[in-house]
């Protein structure tokens, strides 16, 4: 008896492209899950300082 075929790529690219090969979605704010706790803590304070500076700049601009 003849040996059976182990693998073929026939039709695989056609199947893949029927719905289009899409890039994974990237989001504006990626999750911080799994990020170092020390970094996340400092990041929180840094964001707060940035928000205060922006608020002050807006107040000075409008005044």
Curated annotation (Swiss-Prot):
Q: GO cellular-component terms in the record?
A: cytosolic large ribosomal subunit
Q: Which GO terms describe its biological process?
A: cytoplasmic translation
In Gene Ontology terms, what is one molecular function of this protein? structural constituent of ribosome
Q: Which residues form a coiled coil?
A: none
Q: Where is the composition biased (Basic residues)?
A: 1-26
InterPro entries linked:
Ribosomal_eL29
Question: Which key words are in the record?
Answer: Cytoplasm, Ribonucleoprotein, Ribosomal protein
Question: What does the protein in this record do?
Answer: Component of the ribosome, a large ribonucleoprotein complex responsible for the synthesis of proteins in the cell. The small ribosomal subunit (SSU) binds messenger RNAs (mRNAs) and translates the encoded message by selecting cognate aminoacyl-transfer RNA (tRNA) molecules. The large subunit (LSU) contains the ribosomal catalytic site termed the peptidyl transferase center (PTC), which catalyzes the formation of peptide bonds, thereby polymerizing the amino acids delivered by tRNAs into a polypeptide chain.
Q: How does it assemble?
A: Component of the large ribosomal subunit. Mature ribosomes consist of a small (40S) and a large (60S) subunit. The 40S subunit contains about 32 different proteins and 1 molecule of RNA (18S). The 60S subunit contains 45 different proteins and 3 molecules of RNA (25S, 5.8S and 5S).
Q: Which family does it belong to?
A: Belongs to the eukaryotic ribosomal protein eL29 family.
Q: What is this protein called?
A: Large ribosomal subunit protein eL29
- Organism this protein belongs to: Candida albicans (strain SC5314 / ATCC MYA-2876) (Yeast)
List the taxonomic lineage.
Answer: Eukaryota, Fungi, Dikarya, Ascomycota, Saccharomycotina
């Amino acid at each position: 008896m003849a040996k059976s075929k182990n693998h073929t790529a026939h039709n695989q690219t056609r199947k893949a492209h029927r719905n289009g090969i899409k890039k994974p979605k990237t989001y504006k704010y990626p999750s911080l899950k799994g990020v170092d706790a020390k970094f996340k803590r400092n990041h929180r304070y840094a964001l707060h300082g940035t928000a205060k500076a922006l608020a002050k700049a807006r107040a000075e601009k409008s005044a």
